[in-house]
């Protein structure tokens, strides 16, 4: 089995935090806990699995300890951090990586709606929600948003959740469409979320090592396969450099 790296890259253009619930065996009891899986994309476009982190004790310092662990393993800069909306996480991230921009995790927000819509409607909903973030301009996105709400006009709870989790779409239209496509590449991470969710229904875990053994083959395959070819990655870097003036210089220093 491949071992998790002791040292990671100095900088990551993006780190995506994927939240799942798993069953933990503790003192002859089965306890449901949150596990956070971190996947990073470095400055040359390679993916790194950065570890499983189980919040075993609902500790107020959990996220702060997590970011301290990342720092101890060599990660000094994160440009974008993709995560669910959590006040404790945001505060800890601001302490450890104050210049990092936190972006709503589309996978997590979509998952919040799954229990309230039919199975057949899910793929259609995923497609429409992704499109909200990657239109050429916000006017087009607003039209799509209105159409989406009309689709669920008879489901008051879904409408409330759409307002709760997708009310800040306009904020992201400060970014170019290529950057938004990169930040909201939902499909690149939803497979990992679904895989953990599926396996967790069938078995318990004792700790992070158990998780790593279970998903080792998947992680190895994920790290080997790039999401973007070199030309596409260069375009992403060029667009992101508009918001981070020193980004291209940092990339040049490691090539």
Residue map of PLM features:
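RNase H-like nuclease fold core
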Residues: 1-80, 188-189
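Switch/connector loops and helix/strand junctions flanking conserved nucleotide-binding motifs
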Residues: 23-25, 88-92, 112-114
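A glycine-rich phosphate-binding loop feature that marks nucleotide/adenosyl-phosphate handling sites
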Residues: 84, 161-170, 232-242
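Alpha-helical elements of the RecA-like P-loop NTPase motor core of helicases
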Residues: 61, 87-91, 160
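Basic, amphipathic alpha-helical segments enriched in Lys/Arg and hydrophobic/aromatic residues
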Residues: 196-255
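Extended amphipathic alpha-helical interaction segments
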Residues: 94-191, 202-205, 223-227
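A short alpha->loop->secondary-structure connector
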Residues: 42, 46, 70-75, 91-106
């Amino acid at each position: 089995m491949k071992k998790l790296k002791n040292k990671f890259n100095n900088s990551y253009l993006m780190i995506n935090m994927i939240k799942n619930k798993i069953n933990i065996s503790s003192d002859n009891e089965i306890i449901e806990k949150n596990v956070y899986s971190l996947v990073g994309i470095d400055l040359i476009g390679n993916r790194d699995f950065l570890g499983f982190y189980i919040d075993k004790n609902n500790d107020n310092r959990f996220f702060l300890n997590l970011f301290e662990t990342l720092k101890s393993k060599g990660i000094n800069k994160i440009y974008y951090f993709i995560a669910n909306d959590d006040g404790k996480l945001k505060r800890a991230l601001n302490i450890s990586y104050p210049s990092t921009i936190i972006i709503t995790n589309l996978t997590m927000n979509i998952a919040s709606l799954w229990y309230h819509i039919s199975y057949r409607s899910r793929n259609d909903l995923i497609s429409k929600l992704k499109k909200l973030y990657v239109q050429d301009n916000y006017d087009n996105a607003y039209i799509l948003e209105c159409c989406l709400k009309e689709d669920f006009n008879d489901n008051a709870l879904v409408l409330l959740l759409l307002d709760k989790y997708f009310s800040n779409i306009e904020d992201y239209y400060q970014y170019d469409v290529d950057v938004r496509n990169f930040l909201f590449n939902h499909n690149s991470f939803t497979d990992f979320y679904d895989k953990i969710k599926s396996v967790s229904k069938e078995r318990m875990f004792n700790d992070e090592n158990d998780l790593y053994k279970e998903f080792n083959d998947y992680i190895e395959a994920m790290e080997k396969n790039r999401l973007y070819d070199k030309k596409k990655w260069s375009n992403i870097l060029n667009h992101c450099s508009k918001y981070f003036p020193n980004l291209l210089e940092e990339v040049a220093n490691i090539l």
